């Protein structure tokens, strides 16, 4: 299953700079 990068799903996906929260956190 290919899903778009989601910030806060505890997974560092391609193109993401965060992996466990919002960029503000």
From Swiss-Prot:
The lineage of its organism: Eukaryota, Metazoa, Chordata, Craniata, Vertebrata. It comes from the Eukaryota. Keywords: Calcium, Cell adhesion impairing toxin, Disulfide bond, Hemostasis impairing toxin, Hydrolase, Metal-binding, Platelet aggregation activating toxin, Secreted, Toxin, Zinc. Metalloproteinase that binds to von Willebrand factor (VWF) and induces its interaction with GPIb (GP1BA), resulting in platelet aggregation. Expressed by the venom gland. Ca(2+) binds at residues 6, 9, 11, 13, 16, 19. One of its GO terms (biological process) is venom-mediated suppression of platelet aggregation. Its EC number is 3.4.24.-. There are two distinct forms of the vWF-dependent platelet coagglutinin. The dimeric form (snaclec) is 34-fold more active than the metalloprotease botrocetin in promoting vWF binding to platelets. It is found in: Secreted. GO terms for molecular function: hydrolase activity; metal ion binding; toxin activity. GO terms for cellular component: extracellular region. Its cofactor is Zn(2+). Binds 1 zinc ion per subunit. This is Zinc metalloproteinase-disintegrin-like botrocetin. Residues 4-25 form the Disintegrin domain.
């Amino acid at each position: 299953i290919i899903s778009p990068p989601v910030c806060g799903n505890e997974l560092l996906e391609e193109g993401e700079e965060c992996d466990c929260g919002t960029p503000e956190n």
